[in-house]
Amino acid sequence: MRMSVLGRRTVFLLASVGLISCGATPADPYVEPIDPVEHCGGTCWPGETWEELEAAALGWSTDALDRVREQYAHMASNALLVVDRGVLVVRWGQTNRNHIVQSVRKSFVSGLYGIYEGEGAIDISLDMAALGIDDSVPPSLTDLEKQATLQQLLQARSGVYHEAAAESQGMKDARPERWSHAPGTFYYYNNWDFNVIGVVFIQLTGEDLFQALYDRFAVPLQMQDFAPSNGFYQYETLSEHPAYPFAMSAQDMARYGLLFARQGQWRDEQIVPEDWVEESTTAYSDTGGDFNYGYMWWVGKPDRFHGHRMFAALGGAGHAIFVFPDIDLVVVHRVDAPTYRYGWNEVMELLDRVIRARQ
């Protein structure tokens, strides 16, 4: 049987550092694991491209990974990418294809807020009245609704239940009655909140949202596929405030996940303030499922994810960046929305299988 290029490269690498003899074959039942810290001469970071190693060389169970692949094939997902301690161990599917990220966009903008708040350009304690925010589509905001702060919008706790651009039918069906909850008293996953977060960012910084994503994340993280032209502003007659969809590849999303897995640091630069990473991935609301909610990040409930701390950027039927900071692990899952036929139960089963293979 012919060995893959990656397999030959890994065997050569192991032999070159003295971990296996030159006569060993991929069929050997045991391979001495590589320590990524020693292998990289310190912490592993991607450069212009990702470094890839066989998962078995990093101590993963090949049998358990076979079960991951079975689930992945069953789901017909578009891509799965797994980063273990800064090194790619799984790259399946179209990991360089730019898909619309759906609601994963919100966690990226949360990161931008952290940067600009740290620089003093944004104050999340400001309310809608102070910012001059209303909605020109009737009925406009009441004085009570205008007391909602940016922090409450980040938490999806504004109490403003105005119709919004890019709402799914499920969001529309779940929207509370207008004026039924005061700001800060109730969680509802609210596109009006998230869209206004984007509008206020532009207002306070004077910068285009997609250019800021490029300058603040794509450039320093050396993203391979993202450009400002990947995004657009989606206006609808329901509200004056647009949504801000953008497309990104799995391999670029993984860089953002790794940034947050490492407390906002990239190599020797603190991109996102460490205290913002902690604050934005803290749970403020119980969503009723496997997750709580932070500042436009989903926060895994204790003991649900094999005892690990986990937070995630989730979007659509299955777009996800799962971040496990305690074990320096990032998992990115992508779907081709028009053809994908499964949902979050299958995605979570896939993630469970990944964690079992890692352990």
Task: Name each model feature, range by range.
Residues 118-156, 205-243:
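Active-site helix/loop module of the DD-peptidase/beta-lactamase fold
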Residues 225, 230, 281-330:
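Active-site Gly/Thr loop motif
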Residues 64-95, 322, 328-332:
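A short, well-structured edge-of-sheet supersecondary motif
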Residues 196-200, 244-265, 319-335:
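Active-site-proximal alpha-helical segments within enzyme catalytic domains
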Residues 74-79, 91-134, 145, 182-189, ...:
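Short active-site loop at a secondary-structure junction
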Residues 86, 100-125, 153, 197-201, ...:
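Active-site SXXK
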Residues 155-234:
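A small/polar active-site loop signature that marks catalytic segments
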Residues 20-21:
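C-terminal motif of bacterial Sec signal peptides marking the signal peptidase cleavage site
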